[in-house]
């Protein structure tokens, strides 16, 4: 982030900046700014894309910029054009998951994975868990989840993961052979992931590698 700020992305937080985190949030409309179309009544439960147009910087990420406080603040500003009403009486706690679940759904759709093709999820944070849920909702039969944290692996199992891998004990990639899910290794590709130097691709129908945020 420091490097990004130095080369001109001024909306990105530096380590010296004071900011309030939280880009996954839900809240109620309190009021509107000047020259803003009042499209929803006060007290309406809403979600919004975590982006805020701050002149002259343009759009900055909510919860990752000192110019746009995130969901842990008592009150936040959201972009009216990127805001929408929470539908169907959904509760606020569930609605706050809209952003990570949308990222997960988008990733699974882009992967075009088929139900009989295995999937591997590296990292079981909010987005990784969302990907597992969306994969199982799409009918994918075998989902392998890998994370260093035992708690996250337990959550992955609750979300529907079929195989849990502790990468301290075994590679999630070499585990494919043991599970009988692999053909022959076709090549190794460099994905630049801090803890993995190489990610192997296999001579199977499934050759989709999707990068979601900082997770595969």
Describe the residue ranges of each PLM region.
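Cytochrome P450 core scaffold surrounding the K-helix E-X-X-R motif
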Residues: 1-6
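Glycine-rich beta-strand-centered segment in the early N-terminal region that forms part
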Residues: 7-52, 69, 87-89
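NAD(P)H dinucleotide-binding glycine-rich loop of Rossmann-like/cofactor-binding domains
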Residues: 14, 46-122
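Short, well-ordered loop/turn sites that connect or cap secondary structure elements
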Residues: 39-40, 113, 210
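Loop/turn positions that initiate beta-strands
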Residues: 42-43, 116, 213
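Surface-exposed amphipathic alpha-helices with a cationic face
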Residues: 109, 132-137
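Adenosine-nucleotide cofactor-binding segment
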Residues: 121-124, 136-216
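N-terminal Rossmann-fold NAD(P) dinucleotide-binding loop
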Residues: 128-129
């Amino acid at each position: 982030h420091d490097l990004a700020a130095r080369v001109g992305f001024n909306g990105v937080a530096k380590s010296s900046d004071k900011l309030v985190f939280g880009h996954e949030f839900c809240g109620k409309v309190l009021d509107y700014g000047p020259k803003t179309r009042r499209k929803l009544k006060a007290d309406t439960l809403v979600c919004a894309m975590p982006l805020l147009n701050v002149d002259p910087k343009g759009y900055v990420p909510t919860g990752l910029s000192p110019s746009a406080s995130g969901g842990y603040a008592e009150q936040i500003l959201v972009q009216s054009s990127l805001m929408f009403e929470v539908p169907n009486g959904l509760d606020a706690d569930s609605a706050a998951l809209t952003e990570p679940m949308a990222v997960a759904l988008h990733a699974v759709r882009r992967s075009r994975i088929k139900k009989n093709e295995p999937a591997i999820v590296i990292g079981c944070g909010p987005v990784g868990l969302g990907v597992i849920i969306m994969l199982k909702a799409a009918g994918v039969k075998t989902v392998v989840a890998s994370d260093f944290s035992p708690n996250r692996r337990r959550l992955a199992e609750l979300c529907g993961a079929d195989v849990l891998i502790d990468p301290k004990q075994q590679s999630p990639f070499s585990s494919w052979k043991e599970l009988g899910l692999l053909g022959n290794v076709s090549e190794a590709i460099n994905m630049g992931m801090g803890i993995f130097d190489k990610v192997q691709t296999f001579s199977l129908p499934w050759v989709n590698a999707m990068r979601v945020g900082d997770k595969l």
